[in-house]
């Protein structure tokens, strides 16, 4: 199974703070609560393509 790099972007300010590797066959976008150093708080981060 091939892995691909995915960037997680903050839903508030839009900065791409995290990168992860995930399966290329996933159909849904990943959404997790992570700390954004630019906003200074935990915000929802979404997968970008």
UniProtKB/Swiss-Prot annotation:
> From its record, what is one biological process in GO terms?
translation
Report keywords, A-Z. Ribonucleoprotein, Ribosomal protein
Q: Is this entry keyworded Amino-acid biosynthesis? A: no
One Pfam family, short name please? Ribosomal_L33
Gene Ontology MF: a single term:
structural constituent of ribosome
- What does the entry list under GO cellular component? cytoplasm; ribonucleoprotein complex; ribosome
Q: Does the keyword Transport apply?
A: no
Q: In this entry, which stretches build a coiled coil?
A: none
Q: Which family does it belong to?
A: Belongs to the bacterial ribosomal protein bL33 family.
Against HAMAP family, the record matches this protein to: Ribosomal_bL33
NCBIfam families listed in its UniProt record = PRK00504.1 (NF001764), rpmG_bact (TIGR01023)
Q: What protein am I looking at?
A: Large ribosomal subunit protein bL33A
The species is Levilactobacillus brevis (strain ATCC 367 / BCRC 12310 / CIP 105137 / JCM 1170 / LMG 11437 / NCIMB 947 / NCTC 947) (Lactobacillus brevis)
Give the source lineage, highest ranks first.
Bacteria, Bacillati, Bacillota, Bacilli, Lactobacillales
